[in-house]
């Protein structure tokens, strides 16, 4: 299962949004990978170091790929984090 999402938080996937993203990814029975939409490389969404290491900024598109029993629920929750302004998180 795969989705492409535009990152809305002003700081991109850094600090607080990344922390919430990783925490949420770890709650599901799913293997979730994340990468820039225009690149093939993916990193584990459950790794803070990997997620922040991508350096994804505001208004950039990312690709989420998930497998497992909770794949769709995980993608829904992670998409919600990425498409919500940080002030509302």
UniProtKB/Swiss-Prot annotation:
Modified residues (Phosphoserine): 47
Signal peptide feature range: none
One Gene Ontology term, aspect cellular component: cytoplasm
Domain HPr: 1-89
Inducing stimuli: Expression is highly up-regulated in presence of fructose.
Alphabetically ordered keywords of this record: Cytoplasm, Phosphoprotein, Phosphotransferase system, Sugar transport, Transport
InterPro entries: HPr (IPR050399), HPr-like (IPR000032), HPr-like_sf (IPR035895), PTS-HPr (IPR054908), PTS_HPr_His_P_site (IPR001020)
Name listed for the protein in its UniProt record: Phosphocarrier protein HPr
Lineage: Archaea, Methanobacteriati, Methanobacteriota, Stenosarchaea group, Halobacteria
């Amino acid at each position: 299962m795969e989705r492409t999402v535009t990152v809305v938080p002003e700081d991109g996937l850094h600090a607080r949004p990344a922390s919430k993203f990783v925490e949420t990814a770890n709650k599901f029975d799913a293997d979730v990978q994340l990468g820039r939409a225009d690149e093939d490389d993916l990193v584990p969404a459950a790794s803070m170091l990997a997620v922040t290491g991508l350096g994804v900024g505001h208004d950039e598109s990312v690709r989420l790929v998930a497998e497992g029993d909770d794949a769709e629920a995980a993608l829904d929750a992670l998409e919600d984090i990425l498409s919500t302004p940080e002030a509302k998180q």
